[in-house]
Amino acid sequence: MNHVVKHNHTAVTKVTEFILMGITDNPGLQAPLFGLFLIIYLVTVIGNLGMVILTYLDSKLHTPMYFFLRHLSITDLGYSTVIAPKMLVNFIVHKNTISYNWYATQLAFFEIFIISELFILSAMAYDRYVAICKPLLYVIIMAEKVLWVLVIVPYLYSTFVSLFLTIKLFKLSFCGSNIISYFYCDCIPLMSILCSDTNELELIILIFSGCNLLFSLSIVLISYMFILVAILRMNSRKGRYKAFSTCSSHLTVVIMFYGTLLFIYLQPKSSHTLAIDKMASVFYTLLIPMLNPLIYSLRNKEVKDALKRTLTNRFKIPI
């Protein structure tokens, strides 16, 4: 809804709600896509919530690696839940509206979870570096207080950045149109309907996005560089395989997540095309949160064994 307010005989349109156009406007695709994304979201919730519960209940998973994995699942569950329910509504209603304040709220929470995940992934890489390169000091370096610092600092920092960017964005003026050709609340599609000059805001977003991505990615790359050197120096083939296998799941997630974000957020505005942005956004906002727990569980014997123990001991399910 747009309200027209008159100031000194000048009509100014005040946007009070937005219309999210969704992934597609093809009527024939609405029902199939609703079913597909509903299944994806349910698998995401079950997988990530299950990982959180499993790493909490099973004492053998009370290690730094699974501590970080629990928080990775929390962030995955967080930003997918911010997006998916509202997106699913868009498939079954004629006009999917979202209020001005609720758009800002969803955007803020989405940014909190996304930025937090970047630094949790880098903390997981550092954890693998310490485990492989400094095994005798692992318990000392990765003490419980250190673990909490490595997750609380990203949560606090991401909250600050999210609030700063959201407040900065919503202080600007919007044009008459309130239609956003996107399927979730993000800052890039919203900037297309701003009346104000967006150069400063684009620069701020580019700086924050670039610094967050490159700083966290540099931690990952440096950690894996040392890990690779340590693995190549191992005499035992079995030892090299075991060391690499402990990193393979995390490395797979890192490549998918960082690759997509670098593709989306470090492009200049002129290079963005709506169709490609939507496809890339679907991948990292909906598919990656679904795939992460599957990657960590299917390729991890400890997780599979813990699941068997939990189902057998707590729920009396014979396996």
UniProtKB/Swiss-Prot annotation:
Q: Which residues lie on this side of the membrane: Cytoplasmic?
A: 53-60, 127-145, 224-243, 299-319
- Membrane topology term: Multi-pass membrane protein
Q: Quote the protein name from its UniProt record.
A: Olfactory receptor 8K1
Cellular component GO terms, alphabetical? plasma membrane
Name the protein family. Answer: Belongs to the G-protein coupled receptor 1 family.
What is the protein's species of origin? Homo sapiens
Disulfide bonding pattern of the chain:
none
Q: Which InterPro entries match?
A: GPCR_Rhodpsn, GPCR_Rhodpsn_7TM, Olfact_rcpt
Ranges annotated as spanning the membrane = 32-52, 61-81, 106-126, 146-166, 204-223, 244-264, 278-298
State whether keyword tRNA-binding applies. Answer: no
Report the protein's function. Odorant receptor.
Protein location: Cell membrane
